[in-house]
A protein has these predicted regions:
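Bacterial Sec-dependent N-terminal signal peptides
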Residues: 2, 21-22, 28-35, 53-92
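A short beta-strand motif characteristic of beta-propeller blades
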Residues: 65-67, 114-128, 164-170, 205-211, ...
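Repeated scaffold domains used in trafficking and secretory/extracellular systems
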Residues: 73-81, 130-140, 173-185, 214-225, ...
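Residue position within the beta-strands of beta-propeller blades
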Residues: 92, 147, 190, 230, ...
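Structural motif
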Residues: 98-107, 153-158, 196-200, 236-243, ...
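Short loop/turn segments that connect beta-strands within beta-propeller blades
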Residues: 109-110, 159-163, 202-205, 243-246, ...
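Solenoidal tandem-repeat scaffolds enriched in leucines and small polar residues
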Residues: 203-349
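Blade-level signature of beta-propeller repeat domains, shared across WD40, Kelch, NHL, RCC1
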Residues: 493-535
Length: 535
């Protein structure tokens, strides 16, 4: 050590005297009387410098990439570090041509598809290739998601920890209208409209059952998987699913006659039945289940779907339980009340006190226009109605900065497009399909995003920031997917077949150059969300 220190100082092979008691007391003597003090002090300085340099060298052994992708020792909820090393992942369902597809992963923290060094050009879910992954049912808290592809009817389990396909959990008829998966994963439900079947995959019995319900096109299930409701297109009937006791009836016909069901399956020793639910309905198209598990809000589309009056029908969940076996002709009546919604309703979301309802209202000129209605859940009364994007509203979620986001499809056929065609240059003629609403005020001021307008007298044109492949300067197209990247002030969307990112601060759009996909973006999911409510 001493020789190495001396060599560093340039003293050749000169030896350094051993410490002695006099050296330890030298601080009390005049400097001129002790020339070795300079050597001792210099030696200490050099040793300190060497120690600092060696420490710095050790600490700098890691590359910059190590810090880019370094996870904390204790991850949130003990979640494993994924193979991609990305901490904030958004998964995108992409179809190349309708028959070949993929599930791509992008870095939602940096809004890039590659790693920082660009040594890995992209990330994706391994083992997945179904053609049209149009529906992602995401459960980040459970470290998985389910992807339904309408090209082959497959419902695939995606393992978020390994970023790989865990295989198909079942196959519904291709082109099914809707699927429903509860977070218990005990059943999977599929509404197969073309076949007129409501298919139930029961993981508790390893059985699959198909209930004959002509034109069934929607199915909804609550969080506990105790209530499953089915809806029929162009109908005012709502069905619930219930399970018979083991060997309760010998035949299908006996079960139908005893319970008043529309169908029971299988034909011998039936297990499941579907029965109509008493209540007031007008083209029911969806169900929102209350946060406390007591109420089911049935969304009646009304005139938007060829009926008469849009409304919400409130039902008690207790009588709808799948273990409640009805007796014909008397059925348990779960209805609480029916609340008309003048603005229309096809999508709903609650914060615990207010139910936000998105839909369309028929206008005197025969066109529809979009509205957001608010309902006080304590009094079951409509308290407000606000203009939003036109189209069929099916996406709604909360996000950062106390915002609410609403997405719709086929927005270029409503009142806003008519205003645009008439030369209106205000936001009233913005016919895009995404609306941002800032909550918390006495009144709400929704804004359609991106904000665009055509040129007028003294008004310059404002076009979409990042046009899609069709290069339409004012319209992105239908919004088919949206997810909230929690705590990062952004939402990701599948908007007109491409990925677009919006700020929850002001609704502005982030650059999508490095997350844009080759093919058609169909749906998105935030894989690392803190809760399941971010998707």
């Amino acid at each position: 050590m001493k020789k190495r220190s001396l060599f560093v100082r340039g003293s050749g092979a000169r030896s350094f005297p051993s410490p002695s008691p006099q050296v330890l007391l030298i601080q009390d003597a005049p400097t001129t009387d002790n020339p070795s003090q300079g050597w001792s002090l210099g030696f200490k300085i050099v040793c300190g410098l060497l120690l600092a340099l060696s420490t710095l060298g050790i600490s700098s052994c890691h590359s910059a990439a190590y810090y880019y992708y370094k996870f904390p020792e204790y991850t949130y909820a003990g979640r494993p570090v994924p193979p991609s090393k990305l901490a904030e992942r958004v998964m995108i369902g992409v179809s190349a041509n309708g028959s070949s597809g993929s599930l791509q992963i992008v870095d939602a923290l940096r809004d890039i598809r590659s790693n920082v060094e660009d040594t890995i050009p992209n990330f994706q879910i391994s083992g997945y290739s179904s053609g049209y992954p149009g529906t992602i049912v995401s459960f980040p808290a459970e470290l998985r998601g389910y992807v339904y592809s309408s090209s082959d009817g497959s419902l695939t389990n995606i393992n978020y920890s390994t970023e790989s396909s865990a295989g198909s959990v079942g196959t519904f008829q291709s082109g099914s209208s809707a699927v429903a998966v509860p977070p218990t994963f005990t059943h999977y439900y599929g509404a197969e409209e073309a076949a007129g079947l409501l298919e139930i995959i029961d993981n508790t019995t390893s059985g699959t059952y198909g209930l004959n319900i002509p034109n069934v096109f929607k199915v909804a299930v609550n969080t506990g998987d105790t209530v499953a409701l089915a809806m029929v297109r162009n109908s005012n009937v709502l069905y619930r699913i219930f399970k018979l006791n083991q060997n309760q009836y010998p035949t299908q016909q006996a079960a139908i006659q005893a319970t008043g069901s529309v169908d029971c399956e299988p034909s011998l020793l039936p297990v499941y039945c579907a029965v109509s639910v008493p209540g007031t309905y007008d083209r029911p198209t969806g169900v929102y289940f209350s946060l406390d598990g007591t109420t089911a809000y049935v969304l009646n589309c009304g005139s938007e779907c060829g009926g008469n009056t849009a409304s919400v029908t409130l039902l008690q969940q207790g009588p709808l339980n799948n273990n409640v076996i009805p007796s014909s002709p008397v059925q348990p009546n779960p209805m609480i009340t029916n609340v008309p919604v003048p603005g229309g309703v096809t999508a709903a979301l609650s914060d615990g006190t207010t139910l936000y309802l998105a839909g369309q209202q028929l206008q005197p000129d025969g066109l529809f226009t979009g509205f957001l209605s608010t309902m006080n859940q304590a009094t079951n009364t409509i308290t407000g109605k606000y203009s939003i994007s036109d189209g069929n509203h099916s996406k709604i979620l909360f996000a950062d900065n106390n915002t609410l986001w609403i997405g719709s499809q086929f927005c270029a056929t409503g009142e806003r497009k008519k205003q645009f065609a008439s030369g209106v240059t205000t936001q009233a003629a913005n016919y895009n399909c995404l609306t941002m609403v800032v909550l918390g005020g006495a009144t709400l001021t929704p804004q359609v995003v991106p904000a665009v307008n055509q040129a007028g007298t003294g008004t310059p044109a404002v076009t979409v920031p990042y046009p899609n492949q069709n290069n339409d300067q004012y319209y992105y197209g239908s919004l088919t997917g949206i997810c909230w990247v929690q705590n990062y002030n952004k939402v990701y969307t599948a908007y007109g077949g491409q990925v677009h990112i919006f700020s929850t601060v002001d609704g502005s759009e982030n650059d999508n150059e490095y997350v844009a996909v080759q093919g058609t973006a169909l749906d998105v999911a935030y894989m690392d969300a803190l809760t399941d409510g971010a998707n």
